[in-house]
Amino acid sequence: MWRLRIGAKAKDNTHLFTTNNYVGRQIWEFDANAGSPEELAEVEEARRNFSNNRSRFKASADLLWRMQFLREKKFEQKIPRVIVEDAEKITYEDAKTALRRGLLYFTALQADDGHWPAENAGSIFFNAPFVICLYITGHLEKIFTHEHRVELLRYMYNHQNEDGGWGLHVESPSNMFCSVINYICLRILGVEAGHDDKGSACARARKWILDHGGATYSPLIGKAWLSVLGVYDWSGCKPIPPEFWFLPSFFPVNGGTLWIYLRDIFMGLSYLYGKNFVATSTPLILQLREEIYPEPYTNISWRQARNRCAKEDLYYPQSFLQDLFWKGVHVFSENILNRWPFNNLIRQRALRTTMELVHYHDEATRYITGGSVPKVIAVFHMLACWVEDPESDYFKKHLARVPDFIWIGEDGLKIQSFGSQVWDTALSLHVFIDGFDDDVDEEIRSTLLKGYDYLEKSQVTENPPGDYMKMFRHMAKGGWTFSDQDQGWPVSDCTAESLECCLFFESMSSEFIGKKMDVEKLYDAVDFLLYLQSDNGGITAWQPADGKLVEFIEDAVVEHEYVECTGSAIVALAQFNKQFPGYKKEEVERFITKGVKYIEDLQMVDGSWYGNWGVCFIYGTFFAVRGLVAAGKCYNNCEAIRRAVRFILDTQNTEGGWGESYLSCPRKKYIPLIGNKTNVVNTGQALMVLIMGNQMKRDPLPVHRAAKVLINSQMDNGDFPQQEIMGVFKMNVMLHFPTYRNMFTLWALTHYTKALRGL
């Protein structure tokens, strides 16, 4: 039976190291002797229910660890469920009862170290690179045991589309990239090409691939993985030369201006490209060469294949300028830098420089790397370390961190990001903080204090080592990461939300909270946020936006500002200014003023804001309005808030809720769910926008209707139903945040309960 271990310490202190005793670390372990017959039956039922309903509910409810925690804590929901009938008015007691039920359930899900565990996956291209890399390096069986393989296969079978392919994420239609790499993953894991025990998964996948032109229509990142495996030729790839890291700072795009995920990916990938590395051929590799192309492998024109991309994968068609750019880079990289004498004078030096960067970034993040995409696609880092020296400590340190990325759900094993521990904990604490009152019981008090302890121990207390600016790193001291302190790469909104929580605890009496956080650490957090504000008033996520944009560069290439991060930062800094007016008061006020203007300038014609990290316009509007309100704006004095409220009212469905499709993200316009269904996460966010916009004082009916949806959606145990996927990054790649169904629903109920009490 699989079990989740929290704060798992290193079994091998040589290759795994920590900055804070592994606080927040989440590791799944299989124990063949664990679990009673009843517990095992419960797990199997959850798996069976997901598989049977996978065509209707694509995202897992993340049940396995929840069942484990509820058993361990002997949780029993004793408060009866509230049901609001059609003609019935919601009373204050109804709302408070529903909130109380949800808080008791949510409290039981908190880990002993204070954070809330959760899956953070959802994207279908996360598993295969790990499998391919471990296969190439000969460590597949060591890392992925039989039990791991069973769950890997379960995940791929569960998320294969009806047409035989796989999409970019669990709700996505099939594309070439994910279909090819998942097909290869199945074959590496021992599934035969023509038949298997799951309705010929390989045969159906191969048919989809061949029907859509074959693997030469994979995008660049897919072609790179096929090249290192030896089932594609590097000459059919767009160039990723290691000499890129030599570009001076005055170039429009250089190592320092790249978006951090792209930088981490291209570090390892450019080394492999520059080395022209290809895995040792095996019988399976030779078979794959014949299975994923419609023509014989030896007949493929790699030059013609270089610019191919399936229409299903082509989110941003390449412009004429981009065509010229890539052709120029290819000529320079392959016809000049890769030939004598330049290959000795420049290429070898570039390879050494690239690996210096790889090692620096790996060490600075304790081999967790810069984020979900870098570690998953830039398993390239791990592979580059192995190519450099298969016996190196660098490679062994990467292997030691692989368990940090494994997550087990009822739908199988998925490689996730390194975790969303800090983000989930800060947002979860907001629920308890906003619902805080003087008669709080000991259970809620304990939840608050454990969460505070986790945040305090997870703050980044030092900048990266050495001359970090030279290595394309930036100030980190004072920030909070997305996950834990070991990862070491702070994010602005995670910092802002965590700082806001810490300011609440700072305002509490010592009798309630005990020892408080060092005030200097709060100052450090403020400094970090101030550092990230751009001239336009917006705030970036990881590093200042110093990219020099040109026509052919998408915003996925360089760092830029985000409305959600800006809104969160305004909330935290406005509260900080109230509690600590003596620290950088003018700078903080200037930040808020500029941030408000940035938010107002970014508002869409319909009154919404585009959400970069969640689905999508409702998500962005929630964080934008929250920031405006914290800055002193309200419905009466702010046109932007009035327009935002109108957008929310206009998109409310007949049930009284809201449901937004993930398609809003790539299409950049509001798209409701099919059938105008309700999603409780969107509904919670929209409900809070209405309350912040003083809708209760003008016409409370839309608010009551939304609250009724949330209250009636609550399940017998206090949980809320898992529905559509609600996280995203870079418009196309969806991420699964299953705890959102608890956070945003309960947070909304705290707002609603307070609003009822104030009537």
Swiss-Prot record:
Looking at its record, which EC class is this enzyme? Answer: isomerase
Q: Which reaction does it catalyse?
A: (S)-2,3-epoxysqualene = baruol
A cellular component term, taken from the record's GO annotations: lipid droplet
Q: Which GO terms describe its biological process?
A: tetracyclic triterpenoid biosynthetic process
Its Enzyme Commission number?
A: 5.4.99.57
One MF annotation (Gene Ontology) recorded for this entry: baruol synthase activity
Which parts are the PFTB repeats? 149-190, 522-564, 641-682
Q: Which InterPro entries match?
A: SQ_cyclase_C, SQ_cyclase_N, Squalene_cyclase, Terpene_synthase_CS, Terpenoid_cyclase/PrenylTrfase
Q: What residues make up the catalytic site?
A: D493 (proton donor)
Q: Which UniProt keywords apply?
A: Isomerase, Repeat
What does this gene product do?
A: Converts oxidosqualene to baruol (90%) and 22 minor products.
Q: Give the family, as the similarity comment puts it.
A: Belongs to the terpene cyclase/mutase family.
Q: What is this protein called?
A: Baruol synthase
Which organism encodes this protein? Answer: Arabidopsis thaliana
> Upper lineage ranks?
Eukaryota, Viridiplantae, Streptophyta, Embryophyta, Tracheophyta
